[in-house]
Curated annotation (Swiss-Prot):
II repeats lie at residues 646-910. Belongs to the sodium channel (TC 1.A.1.10) family. Nav1.8/SCN10A subfamily. GO terms for molecular function: transmembrane transporter binding; voltage-gated monoatomic ion channel activity involved in regulation of presynaptic membrane potential; voltage-gated sodium channel activity; voltage-gated sodium channel activity involved in cardiac muscle cell action potential. Disulfide bonds join C276-C318, C856-C865. I repeats lie at residues 116-404. This is Sodium channel protein type 10 subunit alpha. The gene is Scn10a. The channel consists of an ion conducting pore forming alpha-subunit regulated by one or more associated auxiliary subunits SCN1B, SCN2B and SCN3B; electrophysiological properties may vary depending on the type of the associated beta subunits. Found in a number of complexes with PRX, DYNLT1 and PDZD2. Interacts with proteins such as FSTL1, PRX, DYNLT1, PDZD2, S100A10 and many others. Interacts with NEDD4 and NEDD4L. Tetrodotoxin-resistant channel that mediates the voltage-dependent sodium ion permeability of excitable membranes. Assuming opened or closed conformations in response to the voltage difference across the membrane, the protein forms a sodium-selective channel through which sodium ions may pass in accordance with their electrochemical gradient. Plays a role in neuropathic pain mechanisms.
Length: 1956
């Protein structure tokens, strides 16, 4: 690639002139001629890579800096295109002031204006001007605002239309209209503009009052914003890309939904019309009853819906006095039904998107029966979870592909830049060699830098105080205070800011200068790493920080620096002042060149060097400037007035404050204050006592004062200039200011909302809580990356809200006050104004669309509503929101949750905690030493050797005290690193500036047991008093450490470094001095601090190996045997020997598989028994007595099992196993409850509670079922991360909860009238507040009640937020909030309308982000665990994986023998028909037609239609039966070898059966429903799956499902277990609650079956609010606590605490964790499946290979003749195909030939695979493995040893041709000689002696058709040499020279030449 500085400076930019155009025409002509010649020569197009436009020169991009400065006179002028790609296109480019590239067609615009026309040039200038686009953007935004108003005059529209027309005219004049490249209509965004303008004029011309549809197109103007802002175009590109990708998923989804809808249609049609009608109503009258006729129809209590019922035994039943009859209406305005395919499809789509599906579920089960729950389970798990998450998977992948493309683009730019830099380096080297000083070049007049004022640059140097010397020759680093202050602020020397998105890595020739790894979040480089790696950054002051840069000039290195670079912390020594003599001269005013010679000889060289260096410098300067947020004048002002350096006393005062605020304890105190302050805010509740309120107020004042002081101290200590450079400090400052404002305001004033700002202080915890920090960063990154996407989403919401308002506002019956009234009812969700319209669209995005759509369909046209709502649902919810989640997940992969943050202050906190721990250690050691001094004899002598191992406390082990390298403060670099432990290490806890790194080997446990810790502590304290012993041990410890160091070079600490933990004794004892130079050699370990193995410890671990032996473990732990010597018995002596034998016997019993099976069976039985203990148990005394008896039996068996295991395993092993503990606890619960029952204490409340814990019994099954255990293990692994996220969610939610308490506490109460059903609010005109409600309650019907879920305190606030976040029950909470007024006043309709926004904001941040973090965390965790347990593929390169996968697929295949054609001619004729592809296609078409006829069926269709459909059904059955018979006739016994045929056969049998049965059962139809047989017919649809073989994408999706099934089954099992346990709990706790909301006679906790129905429903979180509502009742008017129940208990109230815990835990476990595991598995497998499908060779390619092979090898011999190879290669499809002419390629493949000139299929397949994948070293070994595999499964190849290869054959062929030619010419010559001498007989004699029908003659006739089928093995000499690869290299004849024209010849001939 030609680099851009071939011609530097302004010469890059040339005006576009007529000569330029003529040149382009010449180029085009030359290009065409070359193309023609190529086509003629090759006969086909070149397959080489076509030239592509350069990425950084695309239109709309900014021109890179290294093209030089653009002269002012060329701005907006046509220029010759810089991109070589366009040299053959009639185009030119134009640059505006901001260097944005625009391209235009060089043809005549509108056939009137040439590129050189003045009018066109003016139009171009205007169109590229930045102000033009700004003006248009502002116009569009104003227009959008105007469209939301309804009261604006029509004339305003015309103004906008005129502006848009002007814009379009300018663009058309500048670009031309549509014919050529870069014209107006060639840009799809302009189509939008054009249509908007056209519609505006059409609307003005015709009166559009009636056709409001067209007016709504004005809304599309909002999309014009996208066409103006370039960044948005990219995201829209990604969106369109993902929509394209969704094609396969859409087809699969529609297909699955159609199948489910058909099943639903057959099962449930007409059922939802069944209602409870009053007894005595005439059935004919019932047919005409509409749902409005309430006097006849029973209404479900608490609702306005009629009660549905069914006639089945398990369907819903009617109450007394009512009978179940069919009515004409379906529920929900007649829209919820399965009566026709369309309605069934809508219902299924609703089920898939899970919008209020619990309502459909309850209605269907009530009308049809509980058994149909199976249908819903299938649809929810397959349809909803699988298909919806496939959409997520596809969108995620599309996004990843898009971002990969972006990364590739960046890398391409980087590569280009790299090359540019190399050129620069070469230039510099050349100049340096010539002795030219490029430093002086900087002042050259031509340089872009010359234009910069030197004064302008000076302040920048000041601003980078940390980077070098200032004007007054005083290095700022020399001042230790400044140094520490800057280091604290992250501005330390040795650091340099870098932008996050920096794409360039700079490399100097002699040294790597790519960015170091240590970039912190805020883009700060860690100085230590920079200096340690010796890296420098190209740029201002680059060399000042680390080691000196090495110039390409010869120079002596600075000898004193090497050590600093490598061994020590990267802290500059402050030696480098402005007058530093050594090293190259570094210009302190910020120049970037490293060359230091001082003369310029030749002007040309000077100019050349100047131009290159200056351009590069300007590029680097551009990077540098992009990081400067303020103009230089402001910086100088800030430095002058915001750095407060006064008298020495002031500095002393500052120093003292600095010490105070940077002390780790100060950090700890502030953190604690934040926590306490948060607790104070969370304690607010309603109602509060005055004293409590006063306490909270006082607390608030105290905290505000405290935080104000903290801020003031920090500002003084750091100076405002540095203080405000940290984001956290700005954040603090804002919060403190707001707190002060709030304090100054009155409590109830308008500023009380400011209190909520104080809550943001919680986020300060992120500084000391890495997980919170990471998650905030993830959300931050996502919001950042999502900036554009959020904007797109906003535009989508805006457009749809406007469309809705424009189309539907009139239909909603809007009043002047903006309230919508329909049928006398006020509507909350309507489209009368923009705000309500926005809310409706937002609600659809939340996934709730169906209820609004019903209302819309009632008030307006059904079609408009369906289209509008479904479009928003599919586009907004499924695509855009999934793209959001994709971005979130993407952020996860970038940020690992477990990674600790490299933030100095985080470590301050850890240091403070470490100090406290040290104090704790010392105290514990003092106590331990006191004890040990009295009990010294107890310690065994051998253990003293452990004493010197310094123990790590838990927090240290966790964090390894890796404090941030606050590098500037260690001044004494010259001291030996480990010379004095007393000096260096004694201070490591207190000195925050020491870098301590204690890495731990991966395999080690991070935490020591506390016992051991204490043990070691007491041992070391004992040794304090025994210096002699210590002295003896020291050499050994020393040895150990040396051993360690030798083993693992490069750490920074040895065990010595932890000296402070060993107390004064370590410090008192001088350790051997370590010389400074040896630092790196002696004390380092690369990632390991494994101590020397102690023999004692090794011996201790040996008993753990006993698991593998057939003998039991020790019974007790060492601790027990040490303290109780009696436990330590000799098992070889009597009587203990007998005991040992008993133990061995027990061990064998317990380990026996039968024992385990028996226990599993017992667990299942006992769990099953629990299911019978329902609410009706008292009514079944016999069942009750059986259950009591079995309970005792099970308890006895489990106790016996436990005792057996104790004896067999011993206490030690039993109680160190978590699963055994679980068993132990559950057995104890059973035992306790059994004993209580025997002692007749079973009615005691605590025993009752304990009995409910028996529900945990099924948990014991967990450890026994492998599948579930795997899932549980994975979950347990994820628990830390899940808990982290849960905590962070709680913190996020805490803020919203406290805000909710501030806004709504006490305001949700209202006065209700209990006479209505459901209870209705009393009108506020009658009752205005609480006291009025009580006063008017003379009738006893008015009650002042609180909404059950409210914001009266933070805990209830959490519950309310959980309901909002899961979108269940959130409507009631929102309505209460929106209607709320003052405390204790009656709510008014939409009194507080904008409170909706509180919920909108919470849903976006609290609901959307935090709940999706769960998916992210779980997926992330699974990936981590996979890596830990990773298989071989982790250690394989991508190339190897491709080969591995290709070969894996190869091995499982072999050539199939095709079904032989029958000899009978009739059978043969049928065989030919049924094996044709056309026959299959016809059958498929018939299957589709059959499916369509099934769709036509409806409920209550006419007699005639039923008959016709019956006939059509019979016709299809006959056709399919005919197909089946024909195939069986033709294929004979082979028919059943194909799975699809067997499937067809079963379907046909079932279809015939259903026809016969339905005929027989016509008379019995009333007693027996033929639904079952209807469904059987649907099995035929399954045959469509055969079609799917053709659709690769869909097959990938199904393949992903098949791969997921095993994992999904395990997850399903776990989910079932959780449901089972919870349903048992539910039966025990909530059996008697009142029927209300979600609980009724069918859905309740009275029986096990009903509990499971409820729990399945809330697995997706659907309707859990309804189930919780009655449980929250505590008394009248909702329930009666004294009502007697059937089982002897009293009351039908719930227990709110138990209910809330029950439902929230279930939702977290099932909905957030288990269901997200399901999602994680699907995403994972989808990725795998897609990878497989995108591999160069897939399963199908090999299938296709073998299918084609069958045609060429009908006998399945696995060989084909070489002559057939060319045709075979051409017949293949896909990547393996080698199209004709292919002879040349095939010969070059060097395939082995066996006798008979045949080639084995595996050899061909290998060669073709190699042809696709290219060369690879792994191929040979894989090939060997493959051949072994193939031999094992297939016919032996051994008898066919290869005797030649195709290449050898070709060589011999050529040799033969040469010999033949020579022979012929010899013969000709001879015959002429003979004819002359007339010796003809002699010639014949000679002829006879020549070789006759041999190889040569065969070669001469090789062009003739084959005669013989069998070729003899003598055709080739059977030498094995010919087989060996690589022989071709030794061959004398080079075949390629003679092959050139052979391809053409071969192509002309029908057959390829081959040996016979």
């Amino acid at each position: 690639m030609e680099l851009p500085f071939a011609s530097v400076g302004t010469t890059n930019f040339r005006r576009f002139t007529p000569e330029s155009l003529a040149e382009i025409e010449k180029q085009i002509a030359a290009h065409r001629a070359a193309k023609k010649a190529r086509t003629k020569h090759r006969g086909q197009e070149d397959k080489g890579e076509k030239p592509r436009p350069q990425l950084d020169l695309k239109a709309c991009n900014q021109l890179p800096k290294f093209y030089g400065e653009l002269p002012a006179e060329l701005v907006g002028e046509p220029l010759e295109d810089l991109d070589p790609f366009y040299s053959t296109h009639r185009t030119f480019m134009v640059l505006n002031k901001s260097r944005t590239i625009s391209r235009f067609s060089a043809t005549w615009a509108l056939w009137l204006f040439s590129p050189f026309n003045l009018i066109r040039r003016t139009a171009i200038k205007v169109s590229v001007h930045s102000w033009f686009s700004i003006f248009i953007t502002i116009t569009i935004l104003v227009n959008c605002v105007c469209m939301t108003r309804t009261d604006l005059p029509e004339k305003v529209e015309y103004v906008f239309t005129v502006i848009y027309t002007f814009e379009a005219l300018i663009k058309i004049l500048a670009r031309g209209f549509c014919l050529n490249e870069f014209t107006y209509l060639r840009d799809p965004w302009n189509w939008l503009d054009f249509s908007v303008i056209t519609l505006a004029y059409v609307g003005a011309a015709i009166d559009l009052r009636g056709i409001s549809g067209l007016r709504t197109f004005r809304v599309l103007r909002a999309l014009k914003t996208v066409s103006v802002i370039p960044g948005l175009k990219v995201i829209v590109g990604a969106l369109i890309h993902s929509v394209r990708k969704l094609a396969d998923v859409t087809i699969l989804t529609v297909f699955c939904l159609s199948v489910f809808a058909l099943v639903g249609l057959q099962l449930f049609k007409g059922n939802l019309k069944n209602k409870c009608i009053r007894n005595g109503t005439d059935p004919h009258k019932a047919d005409n009853l509409s749902s409005e006729m309430a006097e006849y129809i029973f209404i479900k209590p608490g609702t306005t819906d009629p009660l549905l019922c069914g006639n089945g035994s398990d369907a819903g039943h009617c109450p007394g006095g009512y009978v179940c009859l069919k009515t004409p209406d379906n529920p929900d305005f007649n829209y919820t039904s399965f009566d026709s395919f369309a309605w069934a499809f809508l219902s299924l789509f609703r089920l898939m998107t899970q919008d209020s599906w619990e309502r459909l579920y309850q209605q269907t089960l009530r009308a049809s029966g509980k058994m149909y729950m199976v249908f819903f389970v299938l649809v929810i798990f397959l349809g909803s979870f699988y298909l919806v998450n496939l959409i997520l998977a596809v969108v995620t992948m599309a996004y990843e592909e898009q971002s990969q493309a972006t990364i590739a683009e960046i890398e391409a730019k980087e590569k280009k830049f790299q090359e540019a830099l190399e050129v620069l380096q070469k230039e510099q080297e050349v100049l340096a060699a010539l002795g030219i000083d490029t430093t002086s070049l900087q002042s050259h007049s031509g340089s872009p830098l010359a234009s910069k004022n030197a004064n302008e640059r000076r302040p920048r140097v000041k601003s980078r105080v940390s980077e070098g010397s200032t004007d007054d020759n005083r290095s700022p680093q020399s001042d230790p205070y400044n140094q520490r202050r800057m280091s604290f602020l992250g501005l330390s020397s040795g650091r340099r800011r870098a932008s996050h998105g920096s794409v360039f890595h700079f490399r100097a020739p002699s040294q790597d200068i790519s960015f170091p790894d240590g970039i912190t979040d805020d883009g700060v480089f860690h100085g230590d790493q920079e200096s340690r790696r010796g890296s420098i950054l190209l740029g201002r002051g680059a060399g000042q920080t680390g080691p000196l840069p090495r110039s390409p000039l010869p120079q002596s290195p600075n000898p004193g620096r090497r050590h600093g670079e490598e061994g020590q912390l990267g802290v500059p020594t402050g030696e480098l002042t402005a007058g530093a003599p050594e090293g190259p001269a570094l210009d302190t005013t910020g120049q970037k060149s490293f060359l230091s010679a001082g003369y310029l000889n030749e002007p040309f060289r000077a100019q050349r060097a100047m131009s290159v260096v200056s351009i590069m410098t300007s590029v680097i300067e551009e990077l540098e400037e992009s990081k400067l947020k303020c103009p230089p004048c402001l910086i100088s002002f800030a430095q002058k007035y915001l750095i407060w350096e006064c008298c020495p006393k002031w500095r002393k005062f500052k120093m003292a404050l600095f010490e105070l605020v940077t002390d780790p304890f100060a950090e700890l105190t502030i953190t604690l204050c934040i926590v306490v302050n948060t607790v104070f805010m969370a304690m607010e509740h309603y109602p509060m006592t005055d004293a409590f309120d006063a306490m909270l107020q006082a607390g608030n004042i105290v905290f505000t004062v405290f935080f104000t002081m903290e801020m003031a101290f920090k500002i003084i200590a750091f100076d405002p200039y540095y203080y405000f450079q940290k984001k956290w400090n700005i954040f603090d400052c804002v919060i403190v200011t707001v707190s002060l404002l709030e304090l100054s305001a009155s409590k109830k004033g308008s500023l009380s909302v400011l209190r909520t700002f104080r809550l943001l202080r919680v986020f300060k915890l992120a500084k000391s809580w890495p997980t919170l920090n990471t998650l905030i960063k993830i959300i931050g990154n996502s919001v950042g990356a999502l900036g554009n996407l959020t904007f797109i989403l906003a535009i989508i919401v805006f457009i749809f809200a406007l469309v809705g308002k424009q189309l539907l506002s009139e239909d909603y019956g809007c009043r002047k006050d903006g309230v919508s009234v329909w049928n006398g009812e006020k509507l909350r969700w309507h489209m009368c104004d923009f705000f309500h319209s926005f809310l409706v669209v937002f609600r659809i995005l939340c996934g709730e669309w169906i209820e609004n759509m019903w209302v819309c369909m009632e008030v307006s046209q059904k079609s408009i509503c369906l289209i509008l709502f479904l479009t928003v649902m599919v586009l907004g919810n499924l695509v855009v929101l999934n793209l959001f989640i994709a971005l979130l997940l993407n952020s996860f992969s970038a940020d690992n949750l477990t990674a600790p943050e490299d933030d100095g202050e985080v470590n301050n906190l850890q240091l403070a905690l470490a100090r406290i721990q040290v104090l704790g250690h010392r105290a514990s050691r003092a106590i331990a030493s006191y004890i040990s001094s009295h009990c010294r004899f107890r310690w065994p002598k051998v253990e003293t050797q452990l004493g010197m191992k310094p123990p790590l406390t838990s927090s240290e082990a966790k964090n390894h005290i890796a404090t941030d390298a606050v590098s500037a403060a260690v001044g004494n670099l010259t001291k030996p690193a480990l010379s004095s432990p007393k000096e260096n290490h004694g201070d490591f806890i207190t000195d925050p500036n020491v870098w301590v790194s204690v890495p731990i080997a991966e395999g080690e446990s991070d935490l020591d047991e506390l016992e051991e810790d204490m043990e070691q502590a007491s041992q070391s304290s004992w040794q304090e008093e025994d210096p002699k012993g210590q002295q003896e041990q020291l050499p050994q410890v020393q040895k150990c450490e040396n051993h360690q160091a030798a083993r693992s070079p490069a750490s920074m600490m040895s065990s010595e470094d932890l000296a402070p933990y060993l107390g004064e004794s370590w410090k008192r004892k001088d350790s051997p001095q370590v010389p400074a130079e040896g630092v790196d050699d002696t004390s380092s370990s690369e990632g390991s601090t494994v101590d020397c193995p102690d023999p004692e410890e090794i011996l201790r671990k040996i008993p753990e190996l006993a698991d593998d032996l057939d003998e039991p473990d020790d019974c007790f732990t060492e601790g027990c045997t040490r303290r109780c010597p009696c436990c330590n018995v000799n098992t070889s002596k009597s009587p203990w020997a007998t005991g040992w034998q008993v133990r061995k016997t027990c061990y064998r019993i317990v380990e026996h598989s039968w024992f385990e099976s028996f226990i599993i069976f017992m667990i299942l039985l006992s769990s099953g028994a629990l299911a019978f203990e329902d609410n009706y148990l008292e009514e079944k005394p016999r069942v009750k007595s059986v259950l009591e008896y079995t309970d005792r039996v099970f308890t006895f068996i489990f106790v016996f099992e436990m005792l057996l295991k104790w004896v067999a395993y011993g206490f030690k092993k039993y109680f160190t196993n978590a699963w055994c503990w679980l068993d132990f606890l559950i057995v104890n619960i059973s035992l306790t409850s059994l004993i209580a029952k025997i002692l007749e204490y079973s009615d005691v409340a605590s025993i009752k509670a304990l009995r409910t814990l028996r529900a945990l019994r099924p948990l014991r099954a967990l450890s026994r079922f492998e599948g579930m255990r795997v899932v549980v293990d994975a979950l347990v692994g994820a628990i830390p991360s899940i808990m982290n996220v849960l905590l962070v969610c709680l913190i996020f939610w805490l803020i919203f909860s406290i805000m909710g308490v501030n806004l709504f506490a006490g305001k949700f109460s209202k006065c209700v009238d209990t006479r209505n059903n459901p209870f209705s609010n009393v009108n506020s005109t009658m009752v205005n507040n609480k006291s009025e409600c009580h006063n008017q309650n003379s009738t006893g019907h008015f009650f002042w009640v609180n909404v059950k879920v409210n914001f009266d305190n933070v805990a209830m606030g959490y519950l309310a937020l959980l309901q909002v976040a899961t979108f269940k029950g959130w409507m009631d909470i929102m309505y209460a909030a929106v209607d709320s007024g003052e405390i204790n006043s009656q709510p008014n309709w939409e009194n507080n309308l904008y409170m909706y926004l509180y919920f909108v904001v919470f849903i976006i941040f609290g609901g959307f982000f935090t709940l999706n973090l769960f998916v992210g965390v779980i997926i992330d965790n699974f990936n981590q665990q996979k890596k830990k347990l990773g298989g071989q593929d982790i250690f394989m390169t991508e190339e190897q994986k491709k080969y591995y996968n290709a070969m894996k697929k190869l091995g499982s295949k072999k050539p199939q023998k095709p079904i032989p054609r029958p000899l009978n001619k009739y059978q043969g004729f049928v065989f030919d028909i049924v094996t044709r592809q056309a026959f299959d296609i016809i059958i498929m078409v018939l299957i589709c037609l059959n499916m369509i006829t099934m769709m036509v069926e409806t409920d209550e269709q006419g007699e005639e239609k039923t008959k016709v459909l019956g006939r059509i059904n019979q016709f299809f059955v006959a056709v399919f039966t005919g197909e089946c018979v024909m195939k069986m006739f033709a294929l004979r016994q082979y028919y059943f070898t194909n799975g699809w045929n067997v499937f067809d056969f079963i379907v046909v049998i079932l279809s015939i059966g259903s026809l016969l049965f339905s005929a027989i059962l016509k008379s019995l139809e009333n007693y027996f429903s033929p639904t079952l047989f209807r469904v059987i017919r649907l099995a035929r649809i399954g045959r469509i799956l055969r079609l799917i073989r053709a659709a690769k994408g869909i097959r990938t999706l199904l393949f992903a499902l098949m791969m997921s099934l095993p994992a999904l089954f395990n997850i399903g099992l776990l989910l079932f277990l959780v449901m089972f346990i919870y349903s048992i709990f539910g039966m025990a706790s909530f059996a008697n609650v009142v029927d209300e909301a979600g609980i009724d006679d069918m859905f309740n906790f009275k029986t096990f079956g009903n509990s499971m129905l409820c729990l399945f429903q809330i697995t997706t979180s659907a309707g859990w609010d309804g189930l919780l509502s009655p449980i929250l009742n505590t008394g009248p008017p909702y329930c009666d606590p004294n009502l007697p129940n059937s089982n002897g208990s009293r009351g039908n109230c719930g227990s709110p605490a138990v209910g809330i815990i029950f439902f929230t835990t279930y939702i977290i476990i099932s909905f957030l964790i288990v269901v997200n595991m399901y999602i994680a598995v699907i995403l994972e497998n989808f990725n795998v499946a897609t990878e497989e499908s995108t591999e160069p060779l897939s399963e199908d390619d090999f299938d296709m290979f073998y299918e084609t092979w069958e045609k060429f090898d009908p006998e399945a011999t696995q060989f084909i003749a070489f002559s057939a190879l060319s045709d075979f290669a051409d017949t293949l499809s896909g990547p393996l195909r080698i199209p004709k002419p292919n002879q040349n390629i095939l010969i070059q493949m060097d395939l082995p030939l066996v006798p008979g000139d045949k080639i084995h299929c595996l050899d061909i397949l290998f060669a073709f695979t190699k042809n696709v994948l290219g060369e690879s070293g792994e191929l040979d070994s894989l090939k060997t493995n493959m051949e072994e595999k193939f031999m094992a499964t297939n016919l032996s190849k051994a008898s066919y040893e290869p005797i030649a290869t195709t290449l050898r054959w070709k060589q011999e062929d050529l040799s033969a041709t040469v010999i033949q030619k020579a022979y012929r010419s010899y013969m000709l010559h001879r015959s002429l000689t003979l004819s002359n001498t007339l010796h003809v007989p002699r010639a014949e004699e000679d002829g006879v002696s020549l070789p006759g029908e041999g190889y040569v003659t065969f070669m001469a006739n090789s062009g003739l058709p084959d005669k013989s089928e069998t070729a003899s093995a003598t055709s080739f000499p059977p030498s094995y040499d010919s087989v060996t690869r690589g022989l071709s290299d030794r061959a004398n004849i080079n075949p390629s020279s003679s092959m050139q024209n052979e391809d053409e010849v071969a192509a002309k001939e029908g057959n390829s030449p081959g040996p016979q």
